[in-house]
Amino acid sequence: MILLQVFLPEITSGQNEKCNIINFASAPGESLSYIVSYNVFIFWTDVGVVNFTVSEAEKDKLKRLYLHGTGLSFPIWNWFFKVKDSYESWTDPVTLKPYEFKRDVYEGGYKIDIHYIFDRGRNIVCSTSSKTNKPEWKDTIKITECTYDVLSILYYTRNIDYSAYNPGDTIPVTILLDNELTNIYFRYLGKENIRVHGFGKFRCIKFSVYLVEGTLFEGGEDMEIWVTDDDNRIPLKINSPILVGSVKARIISMKGIKHRLNSRISKK
């Protein structure tokens, strides 16, 4: 039920690579919304909604791309496990490298706040963190040139040149996760046509994410993601088993997309 973790999971080690992407897939004005559903045995239940927006912002007199992701549990479930998550990232508009990141999470009565300031000139991050029943603490973390946060990495994956890979190839990157530098990878699985309720049939690029076993997810490459096979690379569907049951997310709204939706085969 930790909604944004469906999109921004804990991921495990791989090898690093040069982060030579150019952002062509997203632009200010884009807004994407998803329903997150949970399954135990044979029953699926909608438990919350996740939203992602892109806008322009100015930080330190420089133009930035402001990425914002939110996750909210539906009120009917708040008595059981209330979720109110917010992730913010201020990135370079072209490379998507982050310069500032904020995570404000409330899940089942437990609160986490994390704030990163990226010093790209010195390749360090100044971190300020706090958790429920734990006082605020600060840290300085050495990073690589190609380090991303858990929100900007989602947009990074939309700009990978998948035509340069064969099915089964892995694509490594580096993220800063809970104040630790972690190498991660995605596995390109090829192309597949899928239907999405309310939107029709699409040609998609499919890949998996290698997950760390933890409080929510099982370890392994069982999380699968389908994105549109066009210049928007919009995530349409995500499936993943968790420790008890499984979760899935499907798109319910897309607005302000940068390119024509050329991957749509039909509207039915």
Per-region residue spans from a language model:
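Alpha-helical structural elements
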Residues: 2, 29, 33, 72, ...
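Active-site/ligand-binding surface loops and adjacent short beta/alpha elements
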Residues: 120-177
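Bacterial N-terminal signal peptides
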Residues: 1-9
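Acidic, serine/threonine-rich low-complexity disordered tracts
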Residues: 15-120, 162-268
